[in-house]
Amino acid sequence: MTMHALPRYAVFGNPVAHSKSPQIHQQFALQEGVDIEYERICADIGGFAQAVSTFFETGGCGANVTVPFKQEAFHLADEHSERALAAGAVNTLIFLKNGKLRGDNTDGIGLANDITQVKNIAIEGKTILLLGAGGAVRGVIPVLKEHRPARIVIANRTRAKAEELAQLFGIEAVPMADVNGGFDIIINGTSGGLNGQIPDIPPDIFQNCALAYDMVYGCAAKPFLDFARQSGAKKTADGLGMLVGQAAASYALWRGFTPDIRPVIEYMKAL
């Protein structure tokens, strides 16, 4: 059994080679003034539980979880935060002193902190449109609600899935093609940008939009953000700040140190 001298962390996914988490967490460690290990672990489909068990048995202190294992991580955890219970998914595993695993979900914190602290746009009292009804959107709704927006509307190509989330969280649902009216904040949680696609929404909904936000980052966010900008959105942003923000919240849960996300966002932009 190999034990490690430094505090050891990892991100589990499949695929995971593209993950920027190691660079982000090493920047956090520099802020704290400590040395850590942070690695990418590509778990086999069907082998996630064993991979996590091996990691923690050999000195792992905490782990991030990305697709496709967030729901499996939820079931693997011995206890859960309220956020994780509401989201039904876990992106952060914390190894407790009693040997148990605690599951949390920091995606919503990452999104909300990026919008309110980095982009300087208040969520309280605003109208929010969420595009998509998958796990990414479900994971952020609980924290968005904590910020007390005036209204949250979820729009999805398949109405039934949107209505399921609407009933679960006490928000509104509409078919994507029927979206109308202005929104202060429009958040794209669909994955269409990976294929160059944008959600089937009318351009006039961006006329009074203070922020159009895509939860993915880089080239995949460009189609939606270009469309939003051309349609009148005052400000646009990809999900890099959300990525760094959720990582910072995970780091704080593991180590009790809250990193400053702003310089790390700038560092990641420069890579």
Swiss-Prot record:
Keywords for the protein's UniProt record, in alphabetical order: Amino-acid biosynthesis, Aromatic amino acid biosynthesis, NADP, Oxidoreductase
For NADP(+), which residues are the binding ones?
A: E82, G132, A133, G134, G135, A136, N156, R157, T158, R159, A160, K161, M215, G239
Membrane-crossing segments per the record: none
Q: Name the chemical reaction catalysed here.
A: shikimate + NADP(+) = 3-dehydroshikimate + NADPH + H(+)
Q: Which GO terms describe its molecular function?
A: NADP binding; shikimate 3-dehydrogenase (NADP+) activity
- Its biological function? Involved in the biosynthesis of the chorismate, which leads to the biosynthesis of aromatic amino acids. Catalyzes the reversible NADPH linked reduction of 3-dehydroshikimate (DHSA) to yield shikimate (SA).
According to UniProt, the name of this protein is: Shikimate dehydrogenase (NADP(+))
Q: Identify the Gene3D superfamilies for this entry.
A: Leucine Dehydrogenase, chain A, domain 1, NAD(P)-binding Rossmann-like Domain
Q: Which domain of life is it from?
A: Bacteria
Instruction: List the pathway annotation.
Output: Metabolic intermediate biosynthesis; chorismate biosynthesis; chorismate from D-erythrose 4-phosphate and phosphoenolpyruvate: step 4/7
Q: Which residues bind shikimate?
A: S19, K20, S21, T66, N91, D107, Y217
Record lineage: Bacteria, Pseudomonadati, Pseudomonadota, Betaproteobacteria, Neisseriales
Q: Which organism is it from?
A: Neisseria meningitidis serogroup A / serotype 4A (strain DSM 15465 / Z2491)
- Gene Ontology cellular-component terms listed: cytosol
The coding gene here is: aroE
Stored HAMAP family: Shikimate_DH_AroE (MF_00222)
